[in-house]
């Protein structure tokens, strides 16, 4: 959130303590020292009349109580995938598919390195061919912005395919 928000983002980042032992799996990230404990909020203007309000929340099951509220009115979602921990992302993808909310998958590249090729991730996670998969570095403003732009493009395309009778309304509201 901090890499792309044009306002000072509201964040709930906290130092990890002994209380997280046995709760958070740090096997793939043994040097991790902070974690999001609730949600983040930010804003990004893609155009003078197209403003995105950004909400980010951890993927762990214990945070799901807020997911239904966060997706109400959403145009779509980015499932940010740490390729070192693919198994952690299945439930997030299921969540958005069950709610018929357009989503894209963002493969978070740490230090410009992917652990798996895009097609390998698509196959391993059974992501439909029409769902975009982008590579990004969530710490980099331009990379994150391009991922959000791709989400907006996909969400508009997704909506128009399912609601062709409202195409004029969609372009008029932009």
What are these regions (language model features)?
Residues 80-130:
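Conserved C-terminal guanine-recognition region of P-loop GTPase G domains, centered on the G4
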Residues 33-43, 47-95:
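Switch II of P-loop NTPase G domains
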Residues 8, 62, 88, 114-115, ...:
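Conserved protein kinase catalytic core
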Residues 111-168, 174:
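Canonical P-loop GTPase G-domain recognition
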Residues 2, 68-70, 92-96, 118-122, ...:
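Short, glycine/charged-enriched secondary-structure capping and boundary segments
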Residues 1-29, 33-35, 42-53:
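Conserved G1/Walker A P-loop phosphate-binding module
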Residues 13, 58, 137:
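Residues at the C-termini of beta-strands that transition into short coil/loop
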Residues 4-11, 100, 155, 159:
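Conserved NTP-handling cores and scaffolds of large molecular machines
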């Amino acid at each position: 959130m901090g890499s792309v928000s044009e306002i000072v983002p509201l964040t709930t980042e906290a130092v990890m303590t002994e209380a997280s032992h046995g709760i958070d799996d740090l096997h793939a990230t043994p040097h991790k020292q902070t974690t999001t404990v609730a949600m983040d909020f930010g804003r990004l203007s893609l155009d003078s009349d197209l403003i995105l309000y950004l909400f980010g929340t951890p993927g762990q099951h214990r945070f799901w109580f807020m997911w239904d509220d966060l997706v109400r009115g959403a145009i779509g979602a980015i499932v940010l995938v740490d390729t070192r921990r693919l198994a952690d992302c299945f439930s997030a993808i299921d969540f958005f598919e069950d709610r018929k909310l357009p989503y894209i998958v963002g493969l978070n590249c740490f230090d410009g390195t992917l652990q798996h090729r895009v097609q390998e991730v698509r196959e391993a996670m059974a992501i439909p061919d029409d769902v975009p998969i982008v590579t990004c570095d969530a710490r980099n403003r331009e990379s994150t912005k391009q991922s959000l732009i791709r989400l907006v493009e996909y969400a508009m395309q997704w909506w128009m395919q399912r609601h062709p009778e409202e195409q004029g309304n969609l372009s008029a509201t932009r």
